[in-house]
A protein has these predicted regions:
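Residues that form or immediately flank small-molecule/cofactor binding pockets and catalytic motifs
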Residues: 59, 83, 103, 158-160
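Glycine-rich, aromatic-lined ligand/substrate-binding cores of catalytic
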Residues: 74, 86-136
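Hydrophobic, well-ordered secondary-structure elements that form the walls
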Residues: 38, 98, 141
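Mid-domain catalytic core of redox enzymes
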Residues: 1-91
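A glycine-rich dinucleotide-binding beta-alpha-beta segment and adjacent secondary-structure elements
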Residues: 77-79, 138-139, 143-174
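Short Gly/aromatic-enriched secondary-structure transition segments
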Residues: 12-14, 113-115, 155
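Generic, well-ordered alpha-helical scaffold segments in large soluble proteins
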Residues: 6-9, 101, 136, 140-144
């Protein structure tokens, strides 16, 4: 869990000094991420992924933009776990995990609605935004590393900060 949940919800109130709680309430959390888990119809190596991890960024982009959550400017981390461990996919196939910094407040909480319980409701607009973001990332990966990546995708799943919040209850999906 995140530090806010730990100190303010899980531990007994008397276990954490008030001064520490105040300090923590002012701390800035690290971004969450948008994660694209990809199943390939070929090996990752055959598409040019020779290393287990690849980091894509533009030297001319400011560091603050690299972590901004903007799908056009944020850095991209690509993990190709099947480069090292062939047992993670059927023979002749591969996987990629693509990570991009993302923030919960992006596009009005990813175009979700909040219900009476305070839960994020994933709308059709949310699903469309998630897909649009993923396609921008695929386009960038194709430009910089693998020109025909989308032709080799069997399946992919996209997780946003909303997804991480849903399953972990971490503040802002961080």
């Amino acid at each position: 869990c995140d530090i806010d949940t730990l100190y303010n919800k899980l531990l007994p109130a008397e276990a954490v000094p008030q001064k520490l709680k105040e300090k923590l309430s002012k701390s800035e959390l690290y971004s969450s991420s948008l994660t694209i888990s990809v199943a390939l119809n070929c090996t990752a190596e055959s598409l040019g992924f020779k290393d287990v991890m690849l980091y894509l960024f533009n030297d001319e982009t400011k560091r603050t933009e690299h972590i901004s959550g903007d799908p056009h400017k944020s850095f991209i981390s690509i993990l190709a776990p099947t480069v090292r461990d062939k047992t993670l996919a059927p023979e002749g196939q591969g996987t990629l995990n693509i990570f991009v910094p993302a923030w919960m407040m992006y596009e009005d909480n990813w175009k979700t609605k909040v219900n009476e319980k305070g839960e994020f409701v994933r709308t059709d607009e949310y699903k469309a935004l998630k897909e649009q973001f993923a396609q921008i990332i695929f386009e960038r990966v194709e430009k910089q590393v693998c020109p025909n990546l989308r032709e080799h995708i069997l399946f992919y799943e996209v997780a946003t900060p909303v997804t991480y919040h849903r399953y972990t209850h971490n503040k802002d999906g961080s």
